[in-house]
Amino acid sequence: MSLVIPDKFQHILRIMNTNIDGKRKVMFAMTAIKGVGRRYSNIVLKKADIDLDKRAGECTEEEVEKIVTIMSNPRQYKIPDWFLNRQKDIVDGKYSQLTSSNLDSKLREDLERLKKIRAHRGMRHYWGLRVRGQHTKTTGRRGRTVGVSKKK
């Protein structure tokens, strides 16, 4: 960061209902938004023609609006389908990039659907057990510890 802070420097930006630190570089500052990682923020900034070495607080209003529009409509800006975090949605078959509260609600809906159709994954979630095939004989124990009484 340069020693002189520009006149229109914002220390905290508000993008997609998330506070973003203006002192960090734009690419890394955008990762504070849930559902946005370094790779996705990198490709969005390249599509928006924004310098990656720029600090987030130095972005103008137009640049912020451009970032938001690209993030909300990634397919219109030629971001490939395999890059998105919601591919072939089970309900409508669309490809999209979910962020912040939309991501939380979609994940919750997916789990509710799995529980409702009584799929194996849904039942494991319901029982509070490991879902992805891990061993559970010794690890993942919660609750009260059961002691062993000593023989007299």
UniProtKB/Swiss-Prot annotation:
GO terms for MF: rRNA binding; structural constituent of ribosome
Cellular compartments annotated: Cytoplasm
Entry keyword set: Cytoplasm, Ribonucleoprotein, Ribosomal protein, RNA-binding, rRNA-binding
Region (Disordered): 133-152
Classification via InterPro entries: Rbsml_uS13_C, Ribosomal_uS13, Ribosomal_uS13-like_H2TH, Ribosomal_uS13_CS
Main location: cytoplasm
GO cellular component labels: cytosol; small ribosomal subunit
PROSITE patterns: RIBOSOMAL_S13_1, RIBOSOMAL_S13_2
Keyword Transport: no
Superkingdom in the source lineage: Eukaryota
Stated family: Belongs to the universal ribosomal protein uS13 family.
Task performed by this protein: Located at the top of the head of the 40S subunit, it contacts several helices of the 18S rRNA.
Designated name of the protein: Small ribosomal subunit protein uS13
Biological source species: Spodoptera frugiperda (Fall armyworm)
Gene it is expressed from: RpS18
